[in-house]
From Swiss-Prot:
Protein name (Swiss-Prot/TrEMBL): Cytosolic Fe-S cluster assembly factor NAR1
Organism the protein comes from: Candida albicans (strain SC5314 / ATCC MYA-2876) (Yeast)
UniProt function note: Component of the cytosolic Fe/S protein assembly machinery. Required for maturation of extramitochondrial Fe/S proteins. May play a role in the transfer of pre-assembled Fe/S clusters to target apoproteins.
Keyword terms of this UniProt record: 4Fe-4S, Iron, Iron-sulfur, Metal-binding
Region of interest (Disordered), residue spans: 430-476
Pfam families: Fe_hyd_lg_C (PF02906)
Organism placement in taxonomy: Eukaryota, Fungi, Dikarya, Ascomycota, Saccharomycotina
Bias (Low complexity) ranges: 432-447
Length: 607
């Protein structure tokens, strides 16, 4: 970890800096003029004074003569402002609460009669697992309870899982990496300089904001594929608009996510769509329509239920006949009944994917690439995926090997969780460093104590990493090699330790002060995360390309690709609009010096 940062600094739920660098637009309202003049000299002196009631006033003067007094209003900061500001590393608490919160959702529901909005909701896999763990019910029953809450009690029209958006994201992510790997050049916005290092995932908005604001040299290496949240939002709004024959601006999309930074992701300018809207005068005006209108977390949903007793997620008793479906409908029938009529692949619309609990991007890249090679004539029975552990449980590497005993590495991917590991990776990828061949060799094949390697293998096995080998099967030569994420084809990066299953918006473990449990709080939290992971893994699986069905899996992937092309043609949406995003370095607008006491006071102790 950098000596300039402390553990407190890495919190992804922080307040805006005292010296916010976003300029404020001045308002000419609430003005009083003591000396009138035909013209206002903007070059005059301006003072800020406090009146007798404590209100701030802006007083304009020229030659000591007072011309105009403006009553100042409180500064308003939007999510878009935060994205363009370099003052905070990730998100700002007050801004998130003000614009994406359960209170805003309640206000929107209360004003439904005036706005005529149609409400739809999408729910992430990790949030479902967190809620199921908190209420000690199965994933199936939690899904029924969520459908009951949003459809019957809160008046939502449709509810969907994020599985379709995730699978399309996984496929396009793998396509981008494979294209660069096979062609040897950048694709999808990745320039030629990125060919010397791995493609870095951009699914985690906390990591993306960190890169944009502190390490802009990393941006060319980042994947430009959108996250499941944003793809789902685009699909859901267009299909709902088509199904109900209404404008997309009349649709309010709520997304339930495991992370607070997902709120900022929904405010990125490239996820808005311009739509013509008829006004009362029959004139048409362009309005910006976001793919996601509001993002709340599982933790915030619990807060909403506590503040609004008219809503109940779990009935006092849980008889099957009182749940959605009445105990006689299958889950597929239930999902179909409450999704838009034109929602595709309904049987897998709430299903899970193999790999990490953050979506399995690294693992699915390897399996999709394996299927791509099978279609080119490779023997599917000769593939294996080997696990290489890192120096801590939050970093590991997977290698796609071929040809039995004479194994050849065809592809590799790594998973990196937590800011400590992210900082180490970013440091290795910094330009003009590590050019020495000897240094590279040493880094790639760093030796470690075999006992430590066995311990990491045991931890990985217990955590259920995909296709991991048992300790006895791990080759001794492999065990002496430490995972190096800077040398792989692709890196799945998540800001939170343990990934999205431990996102900042997930429901926390019970506190030792409020329970009779005598275990240390850290141990309780560890057990809680493992239990939530078990709930997550209990979600029915639908692999895009599992090895056991490698002959048919490519056809499944083709089905998703063909459907997405039909969707783009039907709604006149480009491939870039549906699947691609872009990133820009955030320029620092103020120059700070650690030797300047005044600057240090303005910035505060956080950064």
């Amino acid at each position: 970890m950098s000596a300039l940062l402390s553990a407190d600094d890495l919190n992804d739920f922080i307040s805006p800096g005292v010296a916010c660098i976003k300029p404020l637009a001045s308002s000419s309202t609430n003005t009083t003029t003591t000396n009138t003049t035909d013209s206002y000299n903007e070059n005059g002196e301006v003072e800020i004074q406090i009146d007798s009631q404590g209100n701030p006033l802006e007083i304009s003067k020229i030659d000591d003569k007072q011309f105009q007094t403006n009553k100042l209003t409180p500064a308003q900061i939007s999510l878009a402002d935060c994205l363009a500001c370099s003052g905070c590393i990730t998100s700002a608490e007050e801004v998130l609460v003000a614009q994406h919160s359960h209170q805003e959702l309640i206000k929107a529901l209360q004003s439904q009669k005036e706005t005529n909005k149609v409400f739809v909701v999408s729910i992430s896999h990790q949030s479902r697992a967190s809620l199921a763990m908190a209420y000690n019910v199965s994933i199936e029953n939690m899904d029924k309870c969520l459908i009951d809450l949003f459809i019957r009690q809160m008046g939502f029209t449709y509810i969907v899982g994020t599985s379709l958006g995730r699978k399309l994201s996984l496929i396009n992510e793998a396509k981008e990496i494979i294209n660069r790997k096979t062609k040897g050049s950048g694709t999808g916005g990745i320039d030629s300089d990125s060919s010397s290092g791995p493609i870095l995932s951009s699914i985690c908005p906390g990591w993306v904001l960190y890169a944009e604001k502190t390490h802009p040299y990393i941006i060319p290496k980042m994947s430009t594929v959108k996250s499941p949240q944003q793809i789902t939002g685009c699909l859901l709004k267009n299909l709902t608009s088509n199904s109900l024959n209404i404008e997309k601006s009349k649709i309010y999309h709520l997304s339930i996510m495991p992370c607070f930074d997902k709120k900022l992701e929904s405010a990125r300018p490239e996820v808005y769509e311009e739509e013509e809207e008829e006004e009362e005068e029959k004139d048409k005006a362009l309005v910006s329509v976001p793919d996601v209108d509001c993002v709340i977390t599982a933790k915030e949903l619990i807060t909403l239920l506590e503040e609004c007793p008219q809503y109940q997620l779990i009935p006092p008793t849980l008889p099957q006949e009182e749940l959605i479906g009445g105990g006689c409908l299958s889950m597929t029938e239930i999902y179909k009944q409450y999704a838009p009529p034109n929602w595709p692949f309904i049987e897998i619309s709430w299903s899970n994917d193999s790999g990490s609990a953050s979506g399995g991007y690294a693992y699915n890249y390897l399996t999709i690439y394996r299927n791509d090679l099978i279609l080119k004539g490779y023997d599917g029975n000769k593939f294996t995926i080997n696990l290489i552990n890192g120096r801590n449980p939050d970093i590991y590497e997977m290698r796609l090997m071929y040809n039995g005993e004479n194994k050849e590495k065809l592809a590799s991917a790594a998973v990196v969780n937590g800011f400590r590991n992210i900082q180490n990776l970013v440091r290795k990828l910094k330009p003009n460093t590590g050019k020495s061949t000897n240094t590279t060799t040493t880094t790639t094949k760093s030796k470690v104590n075999p006992l430590a390697a066995r311990r990491r293998a045991r931890i990985a096995n217990n955590r259920g990493k995909p296709e991991t080998k048992s300790t006895s099967e791990v080759n001794s030569q492999e065990m002496e090699i430490v995972a190096d994420a800077s040398k792989v084809d692709y890196v799945e990066i998540m800001a939170c330790p343990n990934g999205c299953i431990n996102g900042g918006g997930q429901i926390s473990a019970p506190n030792t002060t409020t329970t009779s449990i005598t275990l240390p709080q850290k141990e309780i939290e560890k057990q809680w995360i493992n239990a939530v992971l078990e709930k997550y893994n209990s979600i029915p699986m639908f692999d895009l390309s599992s090895q056991s069905s490698s002959s048919s899996s490519p056809n499944e992937i083709i089905k998703f690709i063909e459907w997405s092309k039909k969707f783009e043609n039907q709604f006149n949406i480009s491939d870039n609009r549906l699947f691609k995003t872009h990133f820009n370095p955030v320029e620092k607008n103020i120059i700070m010096s650690v030797d300047d006491p005044a600057t240090a006071l303005l910035v505060g102790s956080k950064w």
